[in-house]
Amino acid sequence: MLASVSEGLAKRTSKALLMSRVRVLVGTRKGAFVLTADGKRASWSIEGPHFPGWEIYHVKGSPVDPNRIYASQTSTWFGQVMQRSNDGGATWDVLGNTFAYDGVTGTHQWYDGTPHRWDFARVWHLEPSLHDPDTVYAGVEDAALFRSTDGGATWSELSALRTHGTASQWQPGAGGMCLHTILIDPQHPQRMYAAISAAGAFRSDDAGASWTPINRGLRSEQIPDHDAEVGHCVHRLALHPARPNVLFMQKHWDVMRSDDGGDMWYEISGNLPTDFGFPIDVHAHEPDTIYVVPITSDSYHYPPDGKLRVYRSRCGGNEWEPLTNGLPQRNCYVNVLRDAMAVDTLDACGIYFGTTGGSVYVSPDGGDRWDEIVRDLPAVLSVEVQTLA
């Protein structure tokens, strides 16, 4: 009897996996790619490149309507182009491409500490609304936050962030002064988080009307005042939707955690081989299980010892284990960028990441085993995943 019950459960689980689907949205230096599979995540269909030859900094789908996908297409020669798909990435429409700072822009600090005028360069990050497929936020370089409420046709700046009293002290990081992370609190819709290289992390409790720096506890040896209110090079923020007051951060150096919405941070780097890196993410069903990819240093943008290793903590930090099964463990000198890691929400949570060497990996079991979905793409800038019924 027990055997038949177990067999029945296994069959139902297998059927559910076959009926489920995942869609992985990959932005690269030379176009976007769409990878799809059933819930087993063993056999993949690869479509693309969409927008060949263009830098696709970010592609992300709406949590309300998974067929609604937004993409940032950019070129130093041709400028910024926004794209939208209403059919899951099969076809695309050009949207509004005007990003105008509101009012007098003022200045921020340049690399040498001199004043520098705000100049729009590109859209780094897109964050669709949790409730409305026509509302989407855009984080841009030079750092500012924009919003569209008409599906990307027009964009308006939420200027309270850029005009914050500390903005004149902000400086670009090595990749520019970019607003690269936008998080929306699913339990408190008025609360948002933004992260800027190299200004730090900020929180709004009124849907972007005002902002507070949330950098207490951060320490950065690279800036004159190591404990300054702003000026920290935050690489990425992450939260779990069931516990949005707990934030995780990958900083230029240091992996950090806050248990009070960013009011105070403490270090959780623990036994990592190096605490420099770019992405950080949280398991879909385990709020204390987090993932990072240690990189040797800010001078050597490749994994320690040429071994590509994701590290997992099951206790919210400090205690980390290397995840290597299926990943190259010799002569691997790639980087994993800040937007290039994502998780799905299937029962067996899948973890995904892409490399500057053009590989995209999946772990269908929370990191225990890795499979290479595709290789030899252009350098991967972003990875997002949609879990489809």
Regions from the language model: what does each represent?
Residues 1-389:
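Extracellular glycan-interacting surfaces
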